[in-house]
């Protein structure tokens, strides 16, 4: 399934909380950790990375991949960590509330 609308920035920052990564590594990390359930569109990911960089939530620098290719590596900034903590907690509460409703017996 595609990443749910409004969650991409949060998921990308969660990925970057585990260390700097280039775009392909971010996509792979999300797919691996979600058991293949989350798929991230490449163009949406790049737009999100640039948007978050403009907000100071991440920073980027050029590096070399394990295949000797140039790639932009993204890392989370302290502002990004603060944003992740606040938004992550809020989303976790929202998911728990939705889960509580869905766990109810179906009427009629």
Summary of predicted features, one role per range:
Residues 82-108:
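Amphipathic alpha-helical dimerization/coiled-coil segments
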Residues 1-44:
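N-terminal helix-turn-helix DNA-binding core of bacterial DNA-binding proteins
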Residues 53-70, 75:
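Beta-hairpin "wing" of winged helix-turn-helix
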Residues 76-80:
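Accessory beta->alpha helical hairpin/"wing" motif in late/C-terminal subdomains of nucleic-acid enzymes
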Residues 45-52:
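Basic amphipathic alpha-helical segments that dock to polyanions
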Residues 14, 28, 47, 85, ...:
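A cross-family signal for key residues in well-ordered alpha-helices
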